[in-house]
Structure formats: structure tokens, C-alpha cells
């Protein structure tokens, strides 16, 4: 079904539907919800809405401080970076939101329409969908962690570094007995070859930001072993340092656990 929507929206900027999207963008930017749209919780610097029937997302990038405006002149606006970074991921065979239409608003902000990506966040999968202790659920959880490790390893092996690789920014859906993953919120992504170890560490810390009560060391090591197999240029010592340090630093940053890492 999603492929049908992607095909439909590929040339939408040249169709009459584009005018409807621009009209919606103006309405949504003024906090008016057109029929079929629902507001989605987002950061203080964005406004997000979802149209389930049309499988579309709208994201408005609100204007920020003069310093951010200056940065946008040098690096490109957040909307532009989100669009280009998603396209770069898709070109490399890594799933991300497909862009539909983008533009500027009279207020000075920018907006971006994308096709809905199927799936639930890794947070949902680990904290809700795979918490039972029966054999079937345990196998599913192990499969999820192993295939997630392979996916993130492939992302890093191709030089991509996510701006905020939190479990909420990775969606997963199970299709034909395999998990398919997608990266969301790609505004701050970068690409470096070779990939600096400190940036790999930052991504791994972000991904480790789940309580050890919910995701134990065995789970984390299952992910890490699969991740490591995709980055053969890392020596065993480098890989061990990344595994240990990402876990320790994430543990220190978790609320109520400062100083508890051992």
C-alpha cells in the first residue's frame, strides 16, 4: 500500500494536488486542522500533523534565534537538510521518509510533506511489544535486536551518522518474517568516510538511552555483535571500547542513575 502512495506522490508538485497541499500547509501553520488531519506531539521548534487516510505527514520548521538563521545560510535550512538527508539515505538503500512537497510560509518558516513510514518505534518494540517471556516473544525480541544491529551497522558502514539516534527515531515493521527499519528526523545527519570513532560513540550512546531494567546487557550485546559485523575496519580493541563506553555513558545520563555505572 505504501508503494502506491509513494508512486502517487512522486510527481505531485506538478499536479493539482500540490495546490491542495499548499493550502493545507497554510492552514496547519496557523494551528487550524483541516478535515482528516490530527496534531502530533513534537518539539518546541516544530509543528507536526498526520493525515492517516492519505498516509501523509506535515512538518513545519518554526523560526528560531538569529544564530540559527545564520547557520541556515551556511548549512541550509532544517527543512532543506531534512529533505536532502532523507534522499541521501534512500539513494543508499536505507529507508527514510519519502519527500512529497516542501516550501516557505508567509511567516518565514518552512514546511515539508512526507509519505507516512509504516512501523512502530524501537522504544515501543522493546518496552511494550516484546516484553513477554514466552518462547515465541523471546525469539522475536532476539531477532529484532540482531537485525537492528545489522541495520545500524550498515548505516554506519556507509558513512551516515544520525543527528539523534534515539530509539524513538528508528521505526520497525515486521514483513515476511523479517524486520524492516527506517530512520526518522534526519535534519542533523552527516556523512563521514572514514567514520570518526567519537561520532560512532555518540550515536551508540543515544541508542543506549533505555533503562537497563528494560533492556539488559544480553540484549545490548546481541545488538552490538550484529552491529560490529558490519564494521570490519574496527579492531577488536576499538569495538570493545565503543561497546563499553557507550553503555557506561548512557547509564550515567539516565535519570536517577548518575554515578551508578560500574
What kind of region is each of these model predictions?
Residues 122-135:
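AlphaC helix of the protein kinase catalytic domain
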Residues 139-151:
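Conserved alphaE helix
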Residues 72-79, 134, 138-141, 197, ...:
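Flexible, glycine- and charge-enriched loops at secondary-structure boundaries
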Residues 23-123, 153, 157-158, 162, ...:
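Conserved ATP-binding subdomain of kinase catalytic cores across diverse folds
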Residues 172-178:
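Activation-loop N-terminal segment of eukaryotic-like protein kinases
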Residues 1-37:
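Juxta-kinase regulatory segment immediately upstream of eukaryotic protein kinase catalytic domains
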Residues 179-252:
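C-lobe/activation-segment region of protein kinase-like
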Amino acid at each position: 500500500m505504501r508503494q502506491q502512495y509513494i508512486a502517487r506522490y512522486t510527481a505531485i508538485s506538478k499536479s493539482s494536488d500540490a495546490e491542495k497541499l499548499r493550502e493545507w500547509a497554510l492552514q496547519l501553520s496557523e494551528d487550524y486542522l483541516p478535515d482528516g488531519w490530527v496534531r502530533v506531539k513534537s518539539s518546541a521548534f516544530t509543528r507536526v500533523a498526520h493525515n492517516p487516510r492519505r498516509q501523509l505527514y506535515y512538518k513545519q520548521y518554526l523560526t528560531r534565534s538569529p544564530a540559527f538563521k545564520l547557520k541556515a545560510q551556511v548549512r541550509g535550512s532544517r527543512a532543506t537538510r531534512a529533505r536532502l538527508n532523507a534522499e541521501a539515505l534512500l539513494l543508499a538503500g536505507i529507508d527514510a521518509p519519502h519527500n512529497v512537497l516542501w516550501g516557505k510560509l508567509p511567516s518565514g518558516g518552512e514546511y515539508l510533506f512526507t509519505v507516512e513510514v509504516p512501523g512502530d518505534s524501537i522504544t515501543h518494540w522493546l518496552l511494550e511489544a516484546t516484553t513477554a517471556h514466552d518462547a515465541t516473544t523471546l525469539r522475536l525480541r532476539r531477532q529484532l535486536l540482531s537485525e537492528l544491529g545489522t541495520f545500524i551497522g550498515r548505516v554506519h558502514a556507509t558513512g551516515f551518522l544520525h543527528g539523534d539516534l534515539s530509539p524513538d527515531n528508528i521505526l520497525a515493521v515486521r514483513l515476511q518474517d523479517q524486520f524492516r527499519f527506517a530512520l526518522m528526523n534526519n535534519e542533523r545527519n552527516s556523512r563521514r568516510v572514514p567514520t570518526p570513532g567519537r561520532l560512532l560513540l555518540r550515536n551508540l550512546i543515544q541508542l543506549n538511552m533505555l533503562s537497563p531494567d528494560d533492556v539488559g546487557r544480553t540484549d545490548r550485546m546481541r545488538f552490538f555483535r550484529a552491529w560490529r559485523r558490519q564494521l570490519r575496519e574496527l579492531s577488536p580493541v576499538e569495538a570493545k571500547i565503543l561497546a563499553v563506553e557507550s553503555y557506561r555513558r548512557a547509564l550515567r545520563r539516565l535519570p536517577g542513575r548518575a554515578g551508578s555505572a560500574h
